[in-house]
Amino acid sequence: MRRVLLAGGGTAGHTSPLLATADALRRRHPSLEITCLGTPRGLETTLIPAAGYPLELVSPVPLSRALDADLLRTPGRLRASVRETLAVLDRVQPDVVVGFGGYVSVPAYLAARRRHLPLVVHEGNALAGIANKLGARLTRHVATSFPATRLPHAVLTGLPIRRMIATLDRPALRSEGRVAFGLDPDLPTLLVTGGSQGALRLNGSVSAAADALADAGVQVLHVIGPKGEVQVEQRPGGPPYVVERYVDRMDLAYAAADAVVCRAGSNTVTEVAGVGLPAVFVPLPIGNGEQALNARPVVDAGGGLLVADAAFTPEWVRAHVPALLGDPERLAAMARAAAGVMPLDGDERLADLVDLAAGEGVR
């Protein structure tokens, strides 16, 4: 295998596993030419070049579930995007195409099929999206992140995640993490994060309960996202309430924390469970409920709590979170339960499948 094309983007849910897989392939094949395929409107336009990989852009093809004008425009958009993707394939000449779902994947799957190229499909969520349901019908090489995902020919690889997270030793980095964010080295610590875009519900409910958290001696590291806003008065002499818009070193944030309040995207679930961080999952209430399904294996194992978005109020936070952070034995039990649920070597397992597909040739 000399060249590979990795297709995915839009959100961190597609881009992060793509980059983790690219890194795994580069480690085992230092001379491999890796090209990424995305659209002009997603996070990939900044994240992929920053990681040092070439990025080709094609027009996005949103797949509407509703019978509306967008659905009627889909065939024309798809034909145009497939033509653009075919031109990319002809320039790059990859030996295999790997897709991670999202707006760019359907044209990538169809173009790979037309050029008789081996295809690998990776599904990040417990509930497969439309693009990957199509892609899985075009290849034998299908990987999933969660055991309950239903796709033809699927093998469970887990979700590819960053090496700095997969290899994280939280106790060893705890002191460094707390110093890095200006936290007290000894106080129980709550991490709040809504993912790459932040989360209005999490931001509002936790910040509104800051008084109860401070009364319980709980300090907070709150990652509010690029557009988030919170108003918290720092109590003189009280536990720190640290607000960050974005955290590049999430390994230090996870190490600093005793528990996390978060959404339940596949990256977040895999990372917090993999590092053994007790979680309060508040799934995003859109789509087909895939975030709740993502969290279910960790919750069923005892490693997390699942709270509906509408139920995650300041009153809920006051009633439950200080007590959780004040119970070291419960936190330790949740950490042990979470740590064994999600594979941490999804990048290497998926790289194995890419090698296999490239070696077998078409499909």
Question: Whereabouts are the PLM-identified features?
Answer:
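Donor-nucleotide binding loops and adjacent catalytic segments primarily
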Residues: 42, 47-49, 170-179, 183-262, ...
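Active-site-proximal region of nucleotide-activated glycan assembly enzymes
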Residues: 113-175
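Conserved nucleotide-sugar phosphate-binding/catalytic loop shared by glycosyltransferases and other
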Residues: 2-12, 31-82, 310
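A short, well-ordered alpha-helix in the C-terminal region of glycosyltransferases
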Residues: 330-344
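Glycosyltransferases and closely related glycan-assembly transferases
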Residues: 84-97, 105-120, 133-137, 141
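Conserved donor-binding/catalytic loop of nucleotide-activated donor transferases
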Residues: 115, 255-258, 273-282, 301
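Short amphipathic alpha-helix
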Residues: 14-26
